[in-house]
């Protein structure tokens, strides 16, 4: 008889760890931590351990992942992700998400952006199940363990496929910044259609990005960098920002070193290729 994977074996340490985290996550990810009966006042929550969230490095964006997504942005209940910003009287959100990290991985960029942009709601979108669970547990722990009650309340993650459903979550011109950090390079030519930057997808990004908003890209693969630059430069609604602008921008400084992939490249003394583009005004129709 074929043995069960450790992640599904009821007797394994990883299985027990996941079940325990999952039970806590169901309640804690949708409420204000200090209002939950699961956490006593002053009690610390351990940060999650990556070894218990094993996941393949990449996921096929064209597969049917049975994802949940709203029919339209108006149907999205953001209060479940950002309970601190829900108006207690009318139940409405006091802010909208304005910064998106597409393919956020283990959440390093969001966590560094949170204190840098305390007035903005920041969302990470990640297609892989266990990676999403890890980021959720990481944010729960950070929210609970931070002395300031505002700490990390402005970030969260959801499992979603940005290549298919981005306009289902965001209104026209809602976002001010979009990050594409170390995306899957899809080296084989027949796989290039699965890259996160394509002509078709750029039109969707332009739709949800406000005029003057910025697309940030970074990769350690030169071929992918050239591909992203080529497609963004060819699109009529994007214009590349100068090297001087990149050197002075706070987000670029954070993006270079905040992500887990960025730290890995740094350890290996590899190259990091950055390109930033601004969203141009939509031409008037005469």
Swiss-Prot record:
It catalyses: guanosine(46) in tRNA + S-adenosyl-L-methionine = N(7)-methylguanosine(46) in tRNA + S-adenosyl-L-homocysteine. HAMAP family: tRNA_methyltr_TrmB_euk. The modification Phosphoserine is found at residues 7, 59. S-adenosyl-L-methionine binds at residues 103, 126-127, 161-162, 181, 259-261. Its EC number is 2.1.1.33. Present with 2630 molecules/cell in log phase SD medium. Forms a complex with TRM82. The keyword DNA damage does not apply. Pathway: tRNA modification; N(7)-methylguanine-tRNA biosynthesis. Keywords: Methyltransferase, Nucleus, Phosphoprotein, RNA-binding, S-adenosyl-L-methionine, Transferase, tRNA processing, tRNA-binding. GO terms for molecular function: tRNA (guanine(46)-N7)-methyltransferase activity; tRNA binding. It is an enzyme of class 2 (transferase). It is found in: Nucleus. This is tRNA (guanine-N(7)-)-methyltransferase. One of its GO terms (cellular component) is tRNA methyltransferase complex. Transmembrane segments: none annotated. Signal peptide: none annotated. GO terms for biological process: RNA (guanine-N7)-methylation; tRNA (guanine-N7)-methylation; tRNA methylation. The active site is at 184. InterPro entries: SAM-dependent_MTases_sf, Trm8_euk, tRNA_(Gua-N-7)_MeTrfase_Trmb. The keyword Ion transport does not apply. Belongs to the class I-like SAM-binding methyltransferase superfamily. TrmB family. Its main location: nucleus. It holds the Pfam family Methyltransf_4. Methyltransferase that catalyzes the formation of N(7)-methylguanine at position 46 (m7G46) in tRNA, a modification required to maintain stability of tRNAs; its absence resulting in tRNA decay. Both the D-stem and T-stem structures of tRNAs are required for efficient methyltransferase activity.
């Amino acid at each position: 008889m074929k043995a069960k994977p450790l992640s599904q074996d009821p007797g394994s340490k990883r299985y027990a760890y996941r079940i325990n985290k999952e039970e806590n996550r169901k309640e804690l990810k949708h409420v204000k931590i200090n209002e939950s009966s699961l956490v006593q006042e002053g009690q610390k929550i351990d940060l999650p351990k990556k070894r218990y969230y094993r996941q393949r490095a990449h996921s096929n964006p064209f597969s049917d992942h049975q994802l949940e997504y709203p029919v339209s942005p108006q149907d999205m209940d953001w209060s479940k992700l950002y309970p601190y910003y829900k108006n207690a009287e009318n139940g409405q959100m006091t802010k909208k998400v304005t910064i998106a990290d597409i393919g956020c991985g283990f959440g390093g960029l969001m966590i560094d952006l949170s204190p840098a942009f305390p007035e903005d709601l920041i969302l990470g979108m990640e297609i892989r199940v266990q990676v999403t669970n890890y980021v959720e547990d990481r944010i729960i722990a950070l929210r609970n363990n931070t002395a300031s009650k505002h700490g990390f309340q402005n970030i969260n993650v959801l499992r979603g496929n940005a290549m298919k459903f981005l306009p289902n979550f965001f209104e026209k011109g809602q976002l001010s910044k979009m990050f594409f950090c170390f995306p899957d390079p899809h080296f084989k030519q027949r796989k290039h259609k699965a890259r996160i930057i394509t002509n078709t997808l750029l039109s969707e990004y332009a739709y949800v990005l406000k005029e003057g908003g910025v697309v940030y890209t970074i990769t350690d693969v030169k071929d992918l960098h050239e591909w992203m630059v080529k497609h963004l430069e060819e699109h009529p609604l994007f214009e590349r920002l100068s090297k001087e602008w990149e050197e002075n921008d706070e987000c670029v400084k954070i993006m270079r070193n905040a992500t887990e992939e960025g730290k890995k490249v740094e350890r290996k003394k590899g190259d990091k290729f950055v390109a930033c583009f601004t969203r141009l005004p939509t031409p008037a129709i005469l």
